A protein has these predicted regions:
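Beta-rich nucleic-acid/ligand-interaction surfaces
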Residues: 104-113, 221-224, 255-260
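Conserved two-metal-ion catalytic palm core of "right-hand" nucleic acid polymerases
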Residues: 1-152, 160
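Surface-exposed helix-capping loop/turn segments at secondary-structure junctions
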Residues: 95-96, 206-212, 245-248
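Short, conserved aromatic-histidine micro-motifs
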Residues: 52-56, 210-217, 287-302
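PAPS/PAP-binding and catalytic site of the sulfotransferase fold
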Residues: 85, 237, 241
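Right-hand nucleic-acid polymerase module
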Residues: 74-75, 79, 83, 175, ...
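Conserved polymerase palm-domain catalytic core
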Residues: 40, 47, 116-217, 221-238, ...
């Protein structure tokens, strides 16, 4: 079976449909798709096989946490196709060259894995060099919106040669206006974005010789004992990303290890004794309190149930538990309980 056949086979599309329907916000769309499921999947398979498949218009909306972003969400049928493409071709082929410390959107990795690796690197550095070290914290400005279609297609063609698969990939890449930018909401965009800076990962590790390096999508760090060398690394990284149409965010800077670094929602720093401390960032705390207030108000108005509020809070709580956050969690638990009790009391008074 060719890679293209793996994508459009009925079995692959059925498995992709089952994965796509797991997201809560897709329940309504999944129900419509299921009305004539066999017919819908057979039609989709035939459309891809004969290259008559076209993508539906995007649903565009804005999200504001952790920062303002424009999200372009695709239709349910397009989501099914992208699941099949990613699971059967893109993920197994593109990730082969990824370094261990490329943390995002991969099975067995993620934010907590990235945080653990940063902590491990700091400990290793301390054992060899003590506390006198530096960390270059980098960030790509408007990453997804700046990815050039022509560069991305070239990088993909270094890995994938099947012309039929490339037809489908190009269709997805070119589904937005212009020749720059990929939709944040697409599943394929996650793998495309990981691939786009795979070359940077190898450049930093192999050419610049940085032992302690990690990247989570557009966020990366380098640890070294020599500040001057990290300044040189920054110049070379800047030149590398500029060649791909990208630029470093103004926040990119070099900090003493003992002052720590903001990475993946935590502030992580090294103490004089060699202990690595991980604290929830102030912005994350404030965002959670604001979100809880909004959710509690929606609950009091009868628009959502208490379970929805609790699930959101428990998700943040699980994240906070990955750091040195015992007292913070105790305080936030008390805040959450006060908030929910006051809203429940208000509801009782209404009735």
């Amino acid at each position: 079976m060719t890679d293209f056949e793996k994508i459009h086979s009925f079995e692959s599309l059925y498995n992709a449909y089952r994965k796509a329907r797991q997201g809560k916000r897709w329940k309504g769309a999944a129900a419509k798709f299921e009305v004539n499921l066999l017919e819908a999947l057979n039609l989709l398979s035939a459309q891809i096989r004969t290259k008559r498949y076209t993508m539906s218009p995007y649903n565009t909306f804005e999200v504001y946490e952790p920062k303002r972003r424009v999200v372009m969400s695709n239709s349910y049928k397009d989501k099914v196709v992208q699941h099949s493409l990613c699971d059967n071709v893109l993920e197994p082929i593109l990730t082969r060259s990824f370094i261990r410390d490329n943390y995002a959107s991969q099975v067995g990795k993620g934010t907590h894995y990235g945080l653990d690796r940063l902590q491990e690197f700091m400990r290793r550095f301390y054992r060899k060099n003590g506390i006198d070290g530096w960390i270059l914290k980098g960030d790509i400005s408007k990453y997804f919106y700046s990815i050039r279609h022509d560069v991305l297609k070239t990088l993909i063609r270094e890995k994938i040669t099947d012309p039929d698969v490339l037809w489908l990939i190009d269709l997805i890449i070119d589904s937005t206006e212009g020749n720059v930018g990929i939709p944040i909401g697409n599943q394929t965009s996650q793998l495309f974005a990981l691939l786009y800076l795979d070359g940077l990962d190898h450049f930093v590790k192999e050419k610049l010789g940085i032992k302690y390096y990690g990247r989570y999508m557009d966020d990366f760090f380098l640890i070294h004992h020599d500040k001057a060398y990290l300044q040189e690394c920054r110049k070379q990284i800047e030149a590398f990303v500029q060649a791909r149409g990208l630029s470093l965010n103004a926040k990119t800077n070099i900090f003493p290890l003992k002052h720590g670094v903001d990475f993946l929602g935590f502030h992580t720093y090294l103490t004089e004794s060699g202990a690595v401390i991980r604290k929830v960032r102030r912005r994350s705390k404030n965002n959670m309190k604001r979100k809880l207030k909004k959710l509690a108000a929606l609950h009091a108005a009868g628009r959502i149930d208490a379970k929805t509020v609790e699930q959101s809070y428990q998700s943040w709580r699980g994240h906070a538990e990955k750091g040195n956050s015992y007292h913070l969690i105790q305080r936030t638990d008390q805040y959450y309980n006060r908030l929910m009790k006051s809203k429940e009391a208000a509801q009782c008074q209404k009735h």
